[in-house]
A protein has these predicted regions:
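Small-residue-rich hydrophobic transmembrane alpha-helices
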Residues: 51-111, 148-167, 274-338, 371-393
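Transmembrane helical elements of multi-pass membrane transporters/channels
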Residues: 19-38, 140, 151, 174, ...
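N-terminal transmembrane alpha-helices
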Residues: 8-45, 59-74, 78, 103-110, ...
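Interfacial/gating helices of multi-pass transporter permease domains
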Residues: 42-62, 128-133, 193-194, 235-242, ...
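Helix-terminus/linker motif at the lipid-water interface of multi-pass membrane proteins
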Residues: 33-51, 121-128, 184-191, 251-280, ...
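Short runs within selected transmembrane alpha-helices of multi-pass transporters and secretion channels
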Residues: 72, 141-159, 167-175, 196-211, ...
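Short alpha-helical transmembrane segments in multi-pass integral membrane proteins
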Residues: 1-21, 79-144, 188-244, 300-367, ...
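Hydrophobic transmembrane alpha-helices of multi-pass small-molecule transporters
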Residues: 63, 178-183, 208-212, 284-287, ...
């Protein structure tokens, strides 16, 4: 079993975090290639307006994707805790419970988004010259929510057992497939933005199926028996208690980004295209923070399950050092050469769009350290079993992002739009650090006594 699971309760915390984070980072980057491939190929072969159409739905895609990722990660926190405690039967029941809940909620999300998508696009002031393509694109993505759910649930289960490499391998395969499908559907069949959406959904579905095949073939520990499906109300309740706040936290963030997108849409399709290109660059560079957060959720869950609180402290410290170091490198890169990646996305109005891309990348680069703090501490705290506290940080992000977005909309300011996310990161990061110190210095001592005296 050593090849398919990883015990994070022993060994060097820094080494463990690095070895676990790197495959997740690569996997997340390849997952971003789904959307980046769409944007690059659409922008190059269809045009700037088509790129703006895809980009104008980016915040809605983040709402969908974020809800799915947050929920499935939350459902499997209990899986990691049971695994860390050595309760294998309980662990399998949490897997069954997560599967049932994910299917039902995924079905509900699919119907809801498809029913209300057109009013939502109107509410966001989507420019009329890109509305039709934007609507077709996001409707196809909404129809593929269960495909997203399948991959993210199974990859979260594998990560709960300490396996972050297998999801990466399947993501690489599906990312390459997505690019091939993009080229065929957009260039050969001239399907435009809808073709890009179809390619994305198909590739995501295949990555999920590959994860399922691997689990059935290689991991007997996850082969569910009839009795494992007798989940029980207590497991469902705990999974919903952790999973829904994590999903809602992403949703709160997405609502804030939708406010930013609405303010941006007022400025016209050219700036929407520029912001889209800049956001794609940002998303690739910042996937390291998402990976660190995912690692800390698993690390925290396994170690709290094992009752090893001093090791939890060590892990937070190690990951914070890692996050700060990466931030310095990433900020230097994105603020100096990031703008030249604009050439990947557009062939027309390049000078205007590149200038706008550069403004955005420089605005966010100064605030990468707060972004690292947000991801590490939010997910780490959730891994310890605290679902509601990090959601308060999500509210802080919404307030920071929303206030700046409203001002930007009123002033019709592109710079204001660019500063909305940094404002959210600073507010949420400060709040999460305060929460962490409260949990470790007050609540954990009540639970475990003077744990500092333990090994």
């Amino acid at each position: 079993m050593k090849s398919v699971q990883n015990d994070m309760t022993v060994g060097s915390p820094m080494k463990m975090i690095l070895s676990f984070t790197f495959p997740i980072f690569l996997g997340n980057v390849f997952q971003q290639f789904y959307n980046m491939a769409d944007a690059v190929i659409v922008g190059k072969f269809v045009g700037t307006k088509a790129l703006a159409a895809v980009g104008s739905t980016g915040t809605i895609m983040f709402l969908i994707y974020g809800f799915v990722v947050g929920m499935t990660a939350g459902f499997t926190v209990l899986t990691a805790q049971k695994f860390g405690a050595g309760d294998m039967q309980g662990m399998r029941r949490t897997v069954a419970g997560a599967g049932i809940l994910s299917f039902l909620i995924g079905l509900f999300l699919t119907v809801t988004f498809m029913l209300f998508m057109k009013p939502l696009l109107h509410l966001m002031h989507t420019p009329s010259d890109i509305f039709a393509d934007a609507y077709k694109y996001i409707m196809i993505v909404s129809g593929g929510i269960l495909a997203q759910m399948l991959y993210n649930l199974l990859s979260s289960i594998l990560r709960a057992l300490g396996n972050s490499k297998i999801p990466l391998y399947f993501l690489i395969i599906s990312a390459l497939l997505n690019i091939v499908l993009d080229l065929v559907l957009i260039i050969v069949f001239q399907m435009g933005a809808p073709g890009a959406a179809i390619a994305t959904v198909v590739a995501q579905g295949i990555s999920g199926v590959l994860c399922l095949i691997y689990i059935m073939w290689k991991i007997p520990l996850l082969h569910l028996k009839k009795e494992d499906w007798h989940v029980g109300g207590q497991i469902y309740a705990i999974q919903l208690k952790i999973g829904l706040p994590m999903a809602l936290q992403y949703s709160i963030t997405a609502i804030g980004t939708m406010m930013v997108q609405s303010a941006l849409n007022i400025l016209g399709s050219t700036l929407v295209a520029a912001f889209t290109a800049a956001s794609k660059i940002e998303q690739v560079v910042t996937q390291a923070y998402v990976a660190m957060g995912t690692t800390m959720a698993t690390y925290g869950a396994q170690n709290i399950g094992a009752g090893n609180v001093p090791r939890i402290r060590q892990g937070f410290k190690a990951c914070t050092i890692l996050g700060i170091g990466y931030s310095l490198v990433a900020a230097t890169f994105i603020m100096t050469v990031g703008k030249y990646m604009t050439y990947l996305f557009v062939s027309e109005d390049v000078d205007i769009i590149m200038s706008s891309v550069d403004i955005y990348l420089k605005c966010i680069g100064f605030f990468f350290i707060p972004l690292a703090i947000v991801n590490i501490y939010r997910n780490g705290i959730q891994g310890l079993g605290y679902g509601l506290l990090p959601m308060m940080a999500g509210v802080a992000k919404l307030i920071g992002r929303g206030v700046v977005a409203l001002i930007a909309a009123k002033e019709r300011s592109y710079l204001g739009v660019c500063l909305a996310s940094p404002a959210a990161w600073v507010l949420a990061g400060g709040l999460l650090i305060a929460m962490y110190y409260y949990i470790m210095n007050v609540h954990m001592k009540k639970m475990f006594g003077d744990y500092n005296q333990k090994a």
